[in-house]
Amino acid sequence: MFAAPNFFLSGASDSVGQIAFTTAGTYSWTVPFPVTSVSVVCVGGGGGIPVPSVSNGQDGGSSSFGSVVTAGGGGGANESSGAAGAGGTGTTISGNIGGGNGGAGGSSSGSGSGGGAGGYSGNGGAGVTTGAGNSGAGGGGGSGGSSGNTGAGGGGVGLLGEGSSGAGGTSSPTGGGGGSSGSAGGSNSGNGALGGAYGGGAGSTNGRAGGGGGGLRYANSVSVTPGNVISVVVGAGGSGGTSNAGTGASGAVRIIWGENRSFPSTNTGDL
């Protein structure tokens, strides 16, 4: 496997392979010969939490593959209104499509936990104000738990196809479980909790709301032309919390090609 700071590329030949972009930014991907059809999954970045008495949490960024697939980022929590971050959604305009929305963050009536990232066939778990978090569905991430004083981060979602959904975090609090082999959300440092990769929303503290999880969208049988260059955008996690301790996880984009490979789960692992 070839690895570079911003993406991971593997495959036995140009007719079968995959590439994953996992660092926030904009990339140019050249379609390899003789590839004429690909499947793509995009995950939006998770939303951040407020900096107390200073600013709102930032929204997570959208992730996209050309103009074909877009997964929206989770919303940042609002400092002035106390509104929780909304879960990310998304759009697809080509191919056999699917995906779920991110879970909304927990409200500010306690200290809201982060929402889980969307799954392949269901939504991420919604954040809570106090108590155990909610499990994700369809391979999505679970939301963090909340003690009522601090909320944990939402779980992210993996890129290798649909797997088990993430469990909700405990009221200790612990972060939501990652769905489809994604990463669990972070515990709370006292200044906030990080979302789990990819797309988990941040957990809050001091009576603030949590960030929303990023949405997931996939498309299959997307027609491409060898040698053409396609823009790939990976959305950043929304920053927030004191010293950025309450930042959502970044999004990601993964492209696969080869015979009989399609999301959510047909030969979607690395080949």
What are these regions (language model features)?
Residues 10-46, 269-271:
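GGW-centered surface loops in extracellular recognition modules
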